Amino acid sequence: MGEDGKLYIVREEILSDSIKKTIKVKELLESGKAKTINEAVKQVGISRSAFYKYRDYVFPFSKFSKGKIITFSMVLEHMPGVLSSILDVVAKERGNVVTINQSIPSMGVASVTISIDTQYMEISIEDFIEELSKQPGVRKIEVLGE
């Protein structure tokens, strides 16, 4: 795959064991829990050849999202304070809102699109999404793009 290869966001549960193990090896090396590739692949239970095959092609989403503008699509219940609680989480995690677009509520819900600059955020995007989804009134949240 060349530099212009397409990138995809794929949920972890559909990845093959080899790819999951490659990611785990990279995490062990990055965290210092394993000093060498040989040590890390033995801990995880993957061959070195499988690791080398995938290592340059798999990255956690957070590696690409740090310092970028990410657009989220949300479905929020039409209740006082729901959007405000979302914005409180963004501010608490040091995100900067670039744009907000909210539809007129229909049948008790409203669609909201928010673009956030993640440059100063310390939290991973995965944890950020989880924190947003725990807010009262949030029915659905997904990443549209960056």
UniProtKB/Swiss-Prot annotation:
Residues 71-146 form the ACT domain. InterPro entries: ACT-like_dom_sf, ACT_dom, UPF0735_ACT_dom-cont. Belongs to the UPF0735 family. This is UPF0735 ACT domain-containing protein TTE2621. It comes from Caldanaerobacter subterraneus subsp. tengcongensis (strain DSM 15242 / JCM 11007 / NBRC 100824 / MB4).
